[in-house]
Curated annotation (Swiss-Prot):
Protein name: Guanine nucleotide-binding protein-like 1
Role this protein plays: Possible regulatory or functional link with the histocompatibility cluster.
Modified residues (Phosphoserine): S32, S33, S34, S51, S68, S324, S561, S562, S563
Keyword field: GTP-binding, Nucleotide-binding, Phosphoprotein
Family: Belongs to the TRAFAC class YlqF/YawG GTPase family.
Entry keyword annotation includes NAD: no
UniProt domain comment: In contrast to other GTP-binding proteins, this family is characterized by a circular permutation of the GTPase motifs described by a G4-G1-G3 pattern.
Regions crossing the membrane: none
Keyword Cytoplasm: no
Lineage: superkingdom: Eukaryota
Ranges of biased composition (kind: Acidic residues): 550-585
Lineage of origin: Eukaryota, Metazoa, Chordata, Craniata, Vertebrata
Domain (CP-type G) ranges: 178-418
Biased composition annotated in UniProt, kind: Basic residues: 1-14
Amino acid sequence: MPRKKPFSVKQKKKQLQDKRERKRGLQDGLRSSSNSRSGSRERREEQTDTSDGESVTHHIRRLNQQPSQGLGPRGYDPNRYRLHFERDSREEVERRKRAAREQVLQPVSAEVLELDIREVYQPGSVLDFPRRPPWSYEMSKEQLMSQEERSFQEYLGKIHGAYTSEKLSYFEHNLETWRQLWRVLEMSDIVLLITDIRHPVVNFPPALYEYVTGELGLALVLVLNKVDLAPPALVVAWKHYFHQCYPQLHIVLFTSFPRDTRTPQEPGGVLKKNRRRGKGWTRALGPEQLLRACEAITVGKVDLSSWREKIARDVAGASWGNVSGEEEEEEDGPAVLVEQLTDSAMEPTGPSRERYKDGVVTIGCIGFPNVGKSSLINGLVGRKVVSVSRTPGHTRYFQTYFLTPSVKLCDCPGLIFPSLLPRQLQVLAGIYPIAQIQEPYTSVGYLASRIPVQALLHLRHPEAEDPSAEHPWCAWDICEAWAEKRGYKTAKAARNDVYRAANSLLRLAVDGRLSLCFYPPGYSEQRGTWESHPETAELVLSQGRVGPAGDEEEEEEEELSSSCEEEGEEDRDADEEGEGDEDTPTSDPGSCLTARNPYALLGEDEC
């Protein structure tokens, strides 16, 4: 055994300093993470297992990973359907932080908000989704799974070989979640693709449309959800855009909380927060449109009269509740059969499955995380039967719901398809869990360059001595100003907690309280045409007919700055489940509003 060498106090001190530097990743001398809790968050992430032994990408980040010592008593793995994204390198994260500190924000023109689906997904390229490889009944389960894993790795290899990580968006790297999509498509007679009306192009992969309508020969219904969050003219413009690009689509406008047309609205105004008491699922706008679309698709092959009768009962019950001033209990109404399929039920079926078997139409619900799939199912049922959350990836396993004896709904976990979208836009779309973001500042800058965040929140520049003087803003300045206004401080040094402030701003955007809507190509030039379009007036009237009566709802309004106090506590933890908060906009002095409660839906925690 070699003789021990003396180790001085000075050497020990130097050793500890070097160890801290390595853990914090501060070899370049940048200590930006010391101003917030992001440093400790990133250090914890470095200690987790982030590699996938067989994956083409060497760094996979498993979001919302739960500690588990093995399978549960029923063989359930809590991490089976977790979101798997490619991890950003530390160099890339630090580069974005420097840009957030140095890059001066400039407002963009309205044309920049126009999104063309051909630029986002590039139809015909390798930006496809994984298909289930050919199989036969002679194959064992192990052989089938091994073949699927090899095919999936080849799929990832093609994408990462054609595009660099900087160009690619976040997309799902978890094969188990894609298997859920395969099963839903195999079971379904009709496929619903749910999108968020604020950015429907983000949630509409053309490869899925071609596969469903072409290879499978199924009808695809595009649901433009949350239409209460966008101006009616923009909703109509998006509807016509998709009809023109994809003529085989059946398009349905949907929202679980229609707005009242008696109050005007201006997108991007200062918002207030409402607290709804009771439930409002029976006031959903869109179930009847979806019924008509399914009737046109089935052409009498399935008896949907029970569904029509249910919609009539829901409308009558909502009207009766408004007159009496009472709300129904969640347990009232006919029972809804809920099934959670096991692995044996998830095994593939034959390619020639019988359509409308036993007189039942199976409707598969597919969409990105946070587009409102679970809220849509609750709106169709008429009460809460599905747990909802604003955390992406909340729906973790395959479930079926019998809406009526002849109508079955299949809920698929949210899937992120590969695209060329900016990752900052994906964060603002609610695709990436905000509590898990390593670097939120560039997303705040992306938002602030498209809507006047500083003016809406009445922020004062951190370096401004004279409030009336003009100062250039960067993303870091906005976060620091919001932290100062909200009182977000670090634990020991009491510095402004910019990381927490950035998370808070992103939550306001995802919840719809800072409204950012994107436009179809050419909308800026034709805005007046769409505002005077007959369908725009019809949409306003339809929302007014089913919208809530203001005299029957008890609301507690709070100013934006004070209502964020509760959110400050939520920022410390991961997003919570539950329902109850709704947001109502109010404008700055002199601005004009067009709708009451246009941000109501995002008060419900979305999945």
